[in-house]
Regions:
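FMN-binding flavodoxin-like domain, especially the glycine-rich phosphate-binding loop
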Residues: 37, 41-45, 56-59, 67, ...
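Short polar catalytic/cofactor-binding loops
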Residues: 51-55
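Short, low-complexity intrinsically disordered segments enriched in A/P/G/S/L with frequent Arg
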Residues: 16-33, 38
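Short acidic active-site motifs
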Residues: 80-82
Length: 186
């Protein structure tokens, strides 16, 4: 992924690397706790989209929904919907695993891989998108959370605005396409 292709707004960052002016503020600590501020918890019309079903990604999507408020969030597994469903929401959270572009393009078993062609046909202009990537730095140290990096490239290419960055401090890995300016894109 060409790191210059991802265009992100550069609002002020606080000491944790979180955007101050972002409408959606989501960060994670090293234990996997997802932290939301009060502005985020007051939002409505937020869609969480995840894959694969079951396992850690699904668990994290459910944790986010509960933390934000089940009455304020709709949650979908991409296995069960068409990409146009993203257009029903101004604010999106996309939750994925560590796998990267080469795996998604090679193995069509991955539901995100089947979802992406439909996504490429829509515009995410005026949409705010937070990315959550679950990574395994032991098994994938050379492409840690690359799936999130690929999603960032796709979302910005479709006109979406990425929100919510996480500091790389404390993470152990060799390389990741999800890092820009020493911050994870989600």
């Amino acid at each position: 992924m060409d790191k210059n292709k991802i265009e992100q707004k550069k609002p002020g960052l606080n000491q944790k690397g979180v955007e101050e002016d972002s409408p959606l503020r989501l960060t994670a600590d090293l234990e996997g706790n997802y932290l939301l501020d009060e502005r985020t918890s007051e939002m409505k019309w937020l869609g969480i989209f995840y894959s694969p079903a079951g396992g850690s990604v699904h668990r994290v999507a459910k944790m986010l929904k509960k933390k934000i408020g089940a009455d304020k969030v709709d949650m979908f597994c991409v296995n069960d919907i068409q990409a146009g469903k993203l257009l029903d929401y101004k604010n999106l959270i996309l939750v994925c695993s560590s796998l990267g572009r080469s795996t998604w393009e090679r193995e069509q078993r991955d539901r995100w891989a089947k979802f992406f062609p439909g996504m490429r046909k829509i515009s995410l202009k005026d949409r705010f998108v937070a990315l959550v990537g679950l990574g395994d730095h032991v098994t994938y140290p050379k492409n840690f959370v690359d799936g999130m990096g690929y999603m960032a490239e796709l979302v910005t290419g479709l006109g979406g605005t990425l929100v919510g960055k996480t500091s790389t401090d404390g993470y152990v890995y060799e390389d990741s396409t999800a890092v820009i300016d020493d911050l994870f894109v989600g």
